[in-house]
Amino acid sequence: MRGGAGMCFASMEAAGSRGMGKGASRRRTARSTAPVGALVERVVVAPAPVEQQRGAGRPEAHPQSVAARAVVTVRRRRKEDAKDRFAEQLDALADRVGRSVLLELVSTETDPRKGTPKKSKPSALVGWFDKKDVKAERVVYTAEFAVDAGFGEPGAVTVLNRHQREFYIESIVVEGFPTGPAHFTCNSWVQPTRVSRDRRVFFSNRPYLPSETPPGLRELRLRELADLRGDGTGERRITDRVYDYDVYNDLGNPDKGVASARPVLGGEQMPYPRRMRTGRPSTATDASAESRVEYPEPIYVSRDEEFEEGKNEMLSEGAIKALLHNFMPLLVSSVSPDIRDFAGFHDVDNLFKEGLRLKQALHDQLFQKIPFVRKIQENSEGLLRYDTPDIIKKDKFAWLRDDEFARQALAGINPVNIERLQAFPPVSKLDPAVYGPPESAITEEHIIGHLDGMSVQEAVEGSRLYMLDYHDIFLPFLDRINAQDGRKAYGTRAVFFLTAAGTLKPIAIELCLPPMTDGCKRAKRVFTPPADATSNWLWQLAKAHVCSNDAGVHQLINHWLRTHACMEPFIIAAHRQMSAMHPIFKLLKPHMRYTLKINALARQILINGDGVIESGFTPGNVCMEMSAFAYRELWRLDQEGLPADLIRRGMAVEDPSQPHGLRLLIEDYPYAADGLLLWSAISRWCEAYVAAYYPSDEAVQADYELQSWYAEAVQSGHADKRGAPWWPRLSTPGDLASLLTTLVWLCSAQHAALNFGQYPLGGYIPNRPPLMRRLVPAEGDPEYAHLVADPHRFFLSALPSLTQTTTFMTVIDTLSTHSADEEYLGERPDEAWTADPAALAAAREFAADVRRAEEEIERRNADPSRRNRCGAGVLPYELMAPSSGPGITCRGVPNSVTI
């Protein structure tokens, strides 16, 4: 890179205020690298109008001019109602009488006399009226231009929509210039002039660093960035394209009463990442709270962040399932109170079988009077049955075994909390003045008999002791959790021993409650592997509490906070501070698809007060406060990359002799072993890509768009942590490649590992209850006799109720589903995403690396020596296998956080 003043992340204060950025869409793009004549499937080119065939519609090319043509691919809605069809006909008629769509070519060069960009005369898009009845999803229109022979290369196209409706441009290809076809990947909704009188700008696929921007495009680059940043005022309309920041102040609704209010997340009192600003008015009773938009009313995200139709259809089906599965248990339980709890495990099994009681109950006279139920009967066959989760397909009783409980810490849906125990006993970091002595109640006597003849010290020094520690994250909230109806929790620790076979076995579980009164010793109970029938059920209950805490930490912290919320500021900043022409924006673009929309939906129905998360997980109405506590105490970007995270948890040590520079202390740790394959592939890809544009440290430091992106993501997007000393620097190509690797990893592989196994591995509630309703009874408690008398029923009564179970299963069924338009790691459906041959070559090598990683994962899953992923009833670990078909597959690594 050449030119530009030196600036790096070390001088963030200056950088944050003067960057610029470019919004880009998340839409799937056409494969338009072929000549225009070889158009993609389903694209229809209708015959040109008669006038055009006579030559009237095409500008005459003089000897000193160039005749050029723009071929515009417009994607139509698949499903249109009568109102849409009528509006389309009106637009076609308006087009016929001159209210057409106008295109204008902008050269990369400036006029030497005027100093302004060279532009063509506006040209109308031809064929809208003639193709008004075409049924294809993609329809191609053309515009003809005659420009001076010295026009230069087209670097941008402007579009003015004089119709009444918005339309979606997928791509533009401009032909006729000596430099060859110019490709413009658009994937954007263009608003009509009645909404916005500004011309939309689309840049060609040639990447330009800011200092290398051709003279003819500099002004447009600046203007487009300013448009996307907006002015930070006013309420956003759903047609807007503006990206900005706000705190999480719309999760509660204080106008409904104190119980419906929720604290603001973000700010000194409760630090949190920032979310997309909507500018909605405050609530009537609390000026600090933003008024809510309840689902299914649309919540603002930049227009091009909306889902495509295929994604919307998938979520609509999921919404129908939620209605049915939630509505039916509520209906039946209102008539038959005795089935609110599971009477036995057979009731749980019946959820996965055809002919459920819920379905049969539809035939009762009572239900026949309800039109909605009659409609379900007639139209929704198949939506009333849950698929059998993978976790019980191969071995129905595997979940009861200790080895399976331990295996899931390495290869389950939350394999990112297991840590090596480096000192014994474990010690809390909480204030002992408030929470009592920090030492764990687990003693050497509790575990010595389970260490295969080793002493505790030998086991620690030999890296044989591991732990799931949910003590400190839960204990500060336990009083408020346990005060809620039907919710009971502990601060938990589970200690595991690494056997000679390379598998883990649980050897102690500690359940802790806070002190009842000042000076009172808090309750600490330790459970060890059972010796008789009663202790077996106490042990099962203790494991269930560990699993429930694990489920809460997984959803609130590892999944939502780390891969959704903490990524949002980097995405917002990218659109605000980096042009679509910027090579780094082009690299990041597929990894930002759908994330802002998903996060906005989460604020509507998942993480909001009384939403799915609060209703389904033990912490209840303190769920998001726990998430904020974890952000304040635990989150650091420099430890979010896989190698740094493994080292932090003591699961790996640096070893230059190993393929990835790390040696895993549990060799058969499927998440880590497979993750390192993908991490390395992503790292090589980012290094090669960065090297193509940044030959020196100075090139990185002088790129003001790049520096402004990172500075703003930190200073504005993570404002509550902006002064932390651990933020990675952005001063060298190595710094940049490392930062990009971490971000791509979090948006793709890390999110996939934490998301797409939720139903397959968590859909059988006894295996992994998200919510517990009873504490573990002690001998002498009234409940203890109930446990002894009917352990099955007591165990199930501690788990979620039937309604809670079916609601939760429905949600994670939807969350675990790949949509048909998913784009997977290594894929770039838009083959014309860049005109840079070096970048395309690096992308092809990356795709090959990803394929090789998938082949290695398949080999590992077939290796009987890897007992944590292969064996009788053992599920293979495929969550890091990059490819997948649509649906619930328990595999597949999408490019971005798409669900």
Curated annotation (Swiss-Prot):
InterPro entries: LipOase (IPR000907), LipOase_C (IPR013819), LipOase_C_sf (IPR036226), LipOase_CS (IPR020834), LipOase_Fe_BS (IPR020833), LipOase_plant (IPR001246), Lipoxy_PLAT/LH2 (IPR042057), Lipoxygenase_dom_3 (IPR027433)
Molecular function in Gene Ontology: linoleate 13S-lipoxygenase activity; metal ion binding; oxidoreductase activity, acting on single donors with incorporation of molecular oxygen, incorporation of two atoms of oxygen
Domain PLAT, chain residue ranges per copy: 68-204
EC number: 1.13.11.12
Family under the similarity heading: Belongs to the lipoxygenase family.
Function: Plant lipoxygenase may be involved in a number of diverse aspects of plant physiology including growth and development, pest resistance, and senescence or responses to wounding. Catalyzes the hydroperoxidation of lipids containing a cis,cis-1,4-pentadiene structure.
Name this polypeptide is given: Putative lipoxygenase 5
UniProt source species: Oryza sativa subsp. japonica
